[in-house]
Amino acid sequence: MSSFAQKKKANGRAGGEYVVLTSKAVQQDAAWMQVVNALKEKHGAEVFFYEKAPRENLVDLQRVKPRYVAIVEKPENLNRDYVIDMHHVSREVDEDIFADFLWGIITGYDANGAMKMLDNSTEPLVIKNAVATITE
């Protein structure tokens, strides 16, 4: 499944720090695959595909032990149960109860919206002024 050979790093993680998970429905859609490929190029990520849920890639995640996981998915395939299950998956890579990677969902109204989200995240958001509503 891997696109390249992986070496074990000093931190105990194999291969890359970044993994992209996406559905086979996204794989069949050229516009959405541009989003996947942009993430792959930007982060040197491995990409894994699933039929129904990211849980199908748990063995791959256990092998790679990524630090970051991005899920590229069409909005109609996302729901409450999807997110809850992903929270569980993020804690099942090893034996302890803690989250094993940071994860997020890249989506949009359409593939162009998802790509715009990706493009706008290139630079970190810096807050220069803020108003606090907490009184002491």
Where are these regions (language model features)?
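Short, charged N-terminal beta->alpha structural module
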Residues: 20-47
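A short, flexible N-terminal coil/short beta segment enriched in small residues
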Residues: 2-30, 134-135
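Structured catalytic cores of large enzymes
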Residues: 4-12, 42, 49-136
